[in-house]
Design a protein with these regions (language model features):
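Residues that form or flank phosphate/diphosphate-binding pockets in enzymes
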Residues: 15, 39, 53
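C-terminal structural segments of small proteins and small subunits
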Residues: 48-82
Length: 82
């Protein structure tokens, strides 16, 4: 499954990006998809992960985020999970 977290600030997004490098997980910072609203223009895409794994990583790394949702990620495109 694939998940996205959104951020209230660019600072939180940058912190998340730094933690991806320090505590690797299959994730990357991406421009926020058009179907989502957030305080900044970035989101973090977690690929091929379980929700509990994502939540655990977020908590362990003290990441400040707004929302966590499941998404479809195919051919480089992110769309909402129906």
């Amino acid at each position: 499954m694939n998940y996205i977290i959104t951020f209230g600030t660019t600072t939180a997004a940058i912190q998340c990006d730094s933690m991806i490098k320090a505590d690797p997980i299959n994730a990357k910072l991406v421009p926020i998809p058009g179907f989502l609203k957030a305080g900044c223009g970035f989101a973090c895409l977690f690929q091929n992960a379980q929700k509990e794994e994502v939540k655990s990583w977020i908590g362990k790394n003290n990441i400040s985020y707004e929302t966590l949702i499941e998404v479809i990620y195919e051919n480089g495109l992110i769309s909402p999970k129906a």
